[in-house]
Amino acid sequence: MSRWLEETGGSRGASYDEAFRELAASGADVHGEADLVAGLLRPGDRVLDAGCGTGRVAVELARRGHDVAGVDNDPSMLEVARRSPDVRWYDADLADLDLPERFDLVVAAGNVVVFLAEGTEQEVVRRLAAHLVPGGLLVSGWRTDRMSAQAYDELARAAGLEPVERWSTWDREPWRDDADWCVSVHRRPETTDERRTA
């Protein structure tokens, strides 16, 4: 069982959604993750929101014209997410992820990597990488008090990914070693006959 389900009991979907609705109503920008991801995409790119929760990031990316799927294994979160018909929703544990499609970009926002079941981190990053097309990007963000940037880099490297960029926030603040947040972008390598088309 993931640390998220252990800590929440899989029952926080409605309250989580309401908290973000209140933030948005107060004028707060609740689309920082989607803004960063959208800046890495081309029109119509296929996106997987891994650990999508209530679908906040996935729904916003779909609204912007991208082909989006979301996956989570918290039933209360997916209940909220499924209210949006513009996204394909999957109920699956990321440690067992085996979807019938591949993506130009996989995003794991909102501390997904630090809420995984202990000991599954490497397998999850490997499975996320396997869902990328050659040249595809894995974008992850988390609090650094629960996992260091270096530890995540090791997971990504072992999954065959190459580092592309790192920031201290979803607003692309330059990386600092003492940052509270880490947002990392890694790429699945391309071979000469598997080039991502422009």
Language-model segments: residues:
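A short acidic, Gly/Pro-enriched loop at the edge of an enzyme's catalytic core
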Residues: 95-105
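A short SAM/SAH-binding and catalytic strip from SAM-dependent methyltransferases
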Residues: 105-119
